[in-house]
Curated annotation (Swiss-Prot):
It comes from Sinorhizobium fredii (strain NBRC 101917 / NGR234). This is Integration host factor subunit alpha. The keyword DNA-binding applies. Pfam families: Bac_DNA_binding. Keywords: DNA recombination, DNA-binding, Transcription, Transcription regulation, Translation regulation. InterPro entries: Hist_DNA-bd (IPR000119), Histone-like_DNA-bd_CS (IPR020816), IHF-like_DNA-bd_dom_sf (IPR010992), IHF_alpha (IPR005684). Heterodimer of an alpha and a beta chain. Belongs to the bacterial histone-like protein family. One of its GO terms (cellular component) is cytosol. GO terms for biological process: DNA recombination; positive regulation of metabolic process; regulation of DNA-templated transcription; regulation of translation. It comes from the Bacteria.
Amino acid sequence: MSGKTVTRADLAESVFRKVGLSRTESAELVETVIDEICNAIVRGESVKLSSFATFQVRDKNERIGRNPKTGEEVPISPRRVMTFKASNVLKQRVLKAHLSRRAKQKQTGTAS
């Protein structure tokens, strides 16, 4: 793994380079897209980005859990959780990149 985290600024810079908007417009575009995704999720809507992923809010029922130290049963309150499900296209891209890196490591004799 590269260990790099892609930030909003990185996304805006990429839009700036690839689309040709100004840096300010690129940053505003990235913020608008993120805001729209967040607003839809807050409203309880699913956000499906084809070939990327689906973001959803799910309701979890109350259930009984267990304290791992004491073994005592503990009630877990009902709650809402957000889920991210990668598309098959994204999963395949990740797998292909992983296999490609491993093949290069074998050729050069390096391992991670």
